C-alpha cells in the first residue's frame, strides 16, 4: 500500500512535470527547413542533467514518442540521416537532420533520460518541437527560368526598338471602316434614288391622270372639256 504522503505528493509531481515553466529543457518550439537541406536544433538543459543521456524522439505524446537517436557522451551519434551531439560545456545538445524530406515534418521532442533512482521518480524530461519542411527551389529550374526570362525580354527590347514600325502597322487597320462607310453611303444614295424615282413616278402618274383631254372631232390644238 502506498503511504499517504507519497499518494499526495505523486499527483503534484506529475502536474509540475507538465507545467512549461517547470520543464528543465528549453529550445525552439518550431523549426523550419527546406527539402534536401540540413537542419540543426539545439536543446538546453540544466546543470544537474549534465551527465545524463540525451535523446531525440518523434511523436506528440511522451509515452508514444519513438526514439530516433540517443547519446550518452559528447561523441556524435548517428542514426541514418539524424545525428546527435552533447555539449556539456554549454549545457546543450544538438540534433541535426540531413537531406530533409517532406515526410520528416512532424512533432518531435528533445529529452533527457532520467533513471528511476535519480530523485525524479524516473520521469524523463521532454521539450516538444514542431518541425516543418517546405519545398526547395531547384537551382537548375531557377537557371532555366532565368534563361527563359532573358529570352522573353529580348523580343520585348527588339519590339521597343521597332516601335515606330509597329505604330505604322497599328494604323493599317484604320482604313477598315472605309468600306463600311462606303457601303453605308451607297445604301443611302440607293435609298434616296429609289425614293426620288418613286416620287417622280407618282408625280408623273398624277400629271398623266390630270392632263387636259382634247376633242377628237375638233381642232387638234383646242382642248375638249366636259360639261361645257
From Swiss-Prot:
Disulfide pattern: 43-110
Domain of life: Eukaryota
Site description Interaction with TYROBP or FcR gamma, residues in chain: 195
GO cellular component: plasma membrane
Tissue expression as described in the entry: Present on the surface of mast cells, dendritic cells, peritoneal macrophages and a subset of B-cells (at protein level).
Keyword check for Transmembrane helix: yes
Segments traversing the membrane: 188-208
Residue spans, topological domain Extracellular: 25-187
InterPro entries with a match to the protein in the record: CD300_family_receptors, Ig-like_dom, Ig-like_dom_sf, Ig-like_fold, Ig_sub, Ig_V-set
Localization per record: Cell membrane
Side Cytoplasmic, residues: 209-228
Signal sequence coordinates: 1-24
Gene3D superfamilies: Immunoglobulins
Alphabetized CDD domains for the sequence: IgV_pIgR_like (cd05716)
Membrane topology recorded in Swiss-Prot or TrEMBL: Single-pass type I membrane protein
Annotated keywords: Cell membrane, Disulfide bond, Glycoprotein, Immunity, Immunoglobulin domain, Membrane, Receptor, Signal, Transmembrane, Transmembrane helix
SUPFAM superfamilies to which the protein is assigned, alphabetical: Immunoglobulin
Positions annotated with a glycan in the UniProt record: 90
Biased composition regions of type Polar residues, renumbered to the chain: 154-170
GO process annotations (BP): immune system process; positive regulation of cytokine production
One of the Pfam families matching this protein, by short name: V-set
Protein family: Belongs to the CD300 family.
Its job: Acts as an activating receptor in mast cells and macrophages.
Assembly information from the UniProt record: Interacts with TYROBP, HCST and FcR gamma.
Protein name as it appears in the record: CMRF-35-like molecule 4
Organism whose genome encodes this protein: Mus musculus
